[in-house]
From Swiss-Prot:
Biased composition (Basic and acidic residues): 128-142
GO molecular function, one term: structural constituent of ribosome
Secretion signal, residue range per the UniProt entry: none
Native organism taxonomy: Bacteria, Pseudomonadati, Aquificota, Aquificia, Aquificales
Keyword Ubl conjugation on entry: no
Keyword Ribonucleoprotein appears in the UniProt entry: yes
Function: This protein is located at the 30S-50S ribosomal subunit interface and may play a role in the structure and function of the aminoacyl-tRNA binding site.
Protein known as: Large ribosomal subunit protein bL19
Length: 154
């Protein structure tokens, strides 16, 4: 009951973010606003998405990159107002939901564990997702119309 209520509230009040669809294994560039004193600048952070957790307002994702031989991980709240935009740089296919094992791998070894997907494969995946989303919306709309008809008949 309460989780259903929370979901409805989140749907109503969460901002609609127009980020590209990305998954674990994708290489993304996150443009994050940083405030230093009275100045504000945008800092890009590029790396592999190693984790996506949660849903709704608490959804976060973790991006890992290696800089001068040192691994850097940064966790971003998905609905943060400080995220300016997210770009998908490279599409990778992995067989795990969490890529924590990349922490032990260095350089090329980590890259070899992620299979690169061709652009046409990615576009086909996006089309299938969009079709499924439209079909779900149609079904929900029909269910609402049926519920309204039943209320009117009652």
């Amino acid at each position: 009951m309460s989780s259903e209520l929370l979901r409805k509230i989140e749907q109503k009040y969460l901002p609609k973010k127009e980020y590209p669809d990305f998954r674990v294994g994708y290489t993304v560039r996150v443009y994050y606003k940083i405030k230093e004193g009275d100045k504000e600048r945008i800092q890009p952070f590029e790396g592999v998405v190693i984790r996506i957790r949660g849903s709704g307002a608490g959804k976060t994702f973790t991006v890992r990159r290696e800089s001068f031989g040192v691994g850097i991980e940064r966790t971003f709240p998905y609905y943060s107002p400080n995220i300016e935009k997210i770009e998908v740089v490279k599409i990778g296919k992995v067989r795990r939901a969490k890529l924590y094992y990349l922490r032990e791998l260095k350089g090329k070894e980590a890259e070899r564990k992620i299979k690169e997907i061709k652009q046409w494969e990615y576009e086909a995946m996006q089309r299938r997702k969009e079709e499924a989303r439209k079909q779900r919306e149609e079904e929900q709309k029909q269910a609402q119309e049926q519920a309204q008809e039943q209320e009117q008949n009652a």
